[in-house]
Amino acid sequence: MELQNKKIMPPPWLAHREIERYSIGWRMGYGEDYIYRFGDWLDTLSPEERTEYRALFPEPVTWKGWWDDEDNGEVLEHGDFFVEMWQPEGRPKYTRQWLQQEFSAGRKRELCLFWGHQPSQDGQLTKSYLSQWWVEDFYTTAAPYLCMEQYMMAAKAELFGDKEIRDQILKCSDQKQIKALGRKVRGFDQKVWDKFKYAIVLLGNWYKFSQNRELREFLLSTGDSVLVEASPYDAIWGIRLAASSPEAQDPMKWRGQNLLGFALMEVRDELRRVTQNEMLCDWSTVWQQ
């Protein structure tokens, strides 16, 4: 390993996960300080070391093209709103049809069923953290968020140009009220929402899990299991079956699309790819004076 005798600085997307690629945060304050120091450090590497470093620390999809000083990201657009696509046309990487084909071919996979958002009484992290209603702060350039439900509904309002409802959503701290406000978005078009909703939830969960170490490690600990929102009520984001139902264990009998579970699996894949070598970094370099 060419880099073994060097203090390895983490790439920007690992050093300050709360700052997006094109955020002004890289041009002021601690973000600017880090990006300059990182650039100076990168210049000390030989061509061989730089190639090795790049292989060890691939860009996340949200920084696609950064190593080549290009913008290779693709977006879905509607008016002034846009969201990054992870897969062509923003389609899910995993689907119920894919899983049913896996099961039909005899490739059964472990299922990890979750539902509900309340923390455990002993303070231990449970599968509730996978819920859209789980309270955990995360940030984007646009705003801070207290849960994924708030992020999704604020994006929904922004998608349809309803600034008033978006502002109300961002000021609200009750998940139930946030969901109700999301239903009041003016100019709503179901076809447009269906095109954008998965990409919105995918990106929001990337922010949520990439910025929170404990959640990130718990998600990665689920391995390659199929994540399943066992909501007995939701046929879009869940399977419309309770975890206690025998049918919940059989994807052939699911009554819902499980879009949330599949989005979380896609986030898990990307986290694993991007963070697999972060233990090699010298984290003391992030806040070095």
What are these regions (language model features)?
Residues E2-Q289:
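Charged, low-complexity intrinsically disordered segments
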